[in-house]
Design a protein with these regions (language model features):
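Short, glycine- and charge-enriched coil/turn segments that flank and shape catalytic ligand pockets
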Residues: 39, 100, 108-113, 185
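An N-terminally biased module of ancient metal coordination in phosphate/nucleic-acid-related enzymes
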Residues: 1-56, 140-142, 146, 161-164, ...
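Short, glycine/charge-rich beta-strand/loop segments that flank catalytic centers
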Residues: 46-49, 104-110
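Alpha-helix N-cap and loop-to-helix initiation/capping positions
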Residues: 78-82, 151, 202
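Conserved acidic, metal-coordinating active-site core of Asp-based
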Residues: 110-171
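Conserved phosphoryl-transfer catalytic core
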Residues: 81-108
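Active-site gating loops and adjacent loop-to-helix segments of metal-dependent hydrolytic enzymes
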Residues: 52-84, 101-103, 122, 126-145
Length: 209
């Protein structure tokens, strides 16, 4: 995880003139990055909202959002509160399995970002409870694990609306990974304006797809 200054430095090293920070369900890092850029790099305010269609998790990117939008901040606060509550529920279930983890250890790892199961897994790794993050998911907190707790998510259409209402442009994140081709026409009707094509795991063939 980079600090805002380190992130801007990496962008400069790559000889890029523009960047966007799109943390999951969180905009706390946007202003510090803009300040760190100091006008040397254009920073597009962004966010990545977690949403669902039935049981399928869908990630919606929002670019050019107004980070001062009260409606957006209210929605993100609601999501953050649910994520925090979820962590406590997970820790209670882990305790029932004689796995003891302090909530503050998890929140310290999450920092100012939105807390998630990944941070629980990293805290378990730090305490030597598991040998790697994957083990934490497979043995304890994954969807089939004994300490699994479902997440609160927006509907995909509502995620698009939240982005648009905040003055942003809604873009479907890594669509090939999400295998949701048949849902895209409905997303477009709801206001979707783009698809993420350049993603670290995508080959040229996938990008063309």
């Amino acid at each position: 995880t980079f600090t805002p200054r380190e992130l801007v430095d990496e962008v400069k090293k790559a000889q890029l003139s523009c960047m966007s920070l799109t943390d999951h369900d969180c905009i706390a890092g946007v202003k510090p990055v803009i300040e760190a850029a100091g006008g040397d790099v254009e920073v597009i305010p962004g966010v990545e909202l977690t949403s669902e269609v039935d049981t399928l998790e869908i990630h919606m990117l929002g670019y050019f959002i107004d980070i001062h939008s009260e409606a957006l901040k209210k929605e993100l606060t609601r999501i953050c509160e649910r994520r925090t509550s979820r962590v406590h529920e997970i820790l209670d279930k882990l305790k029932q399995k004689n796995v003891r983890l302090d909530a503050q250890e998890v929140f310290a790892i999450a920092g100012h970002g939105s807390v998630s199961r990944l941070h629980v897994a990293r805290a378990m790794l730090a305490k030597g409870i598991v040998s790697n993050v994957s083990e934490a998911f497979s043995r304890y907190i994954g969807n089939e694990g004994p300490a699994y707790v479902g997440k609160f998510s927006l509907s995909a259409e509502n995620a698009i609306k939240v982005i648009i209402d905040a003055g942003g442009i809604a873009v479907l994140a890594h669509p090939y990974s999400q295998q949701c081709d048949e849902l895209i026409p409905g997303f477009i009707k709801a206001g979707l304006r783009g698809l993420e094509v350049y993603y670290p795991e995508y080959s040229p063939a996938v990008r063309r797809y």
